[in-house]
């Protein structure tokens, strides 16, 4: 049974999570990709409506359309590869008080250290399931920095229900990505 989390999330709740646990998120997710991470790392200011503290950033460039009433509709919301954000993510976790980062593929040592220090987790979303994940997005509450970065790189504020993820990097210093890589390297060395 997945652990149910509702944003905003306390540090103590995040520190109770362990690698391998399935989680479903209800509440608010903010998207952020390469342009946003670089912008923030270089001292750019968030719009006042964007509340990262005790929240979650999602490495996602959603596909969105406007319906007949002029409301945004998310048709695809799959994760993008998180490794590109490694130069920035640790700083952003600490600077903005993030409690979670959603993406795919995991992240490196700097991000893992920031998760330990600040009380944050990396949550792996299912790659290739963009339409299924979009069904968890109940509405778009806002879009920010669209003029600066364009639709895929803008910050989208999603209201989500039961958004499914797995903890693959926790606040205790464990990284499932590193553990699998190390085990694979050991096994490969046995056969080479």
Q: Language-model features: where?
A:
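Residue "hotspots" at secondary-structure boundaries inside conserved domains
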Residues: 12-15, 50
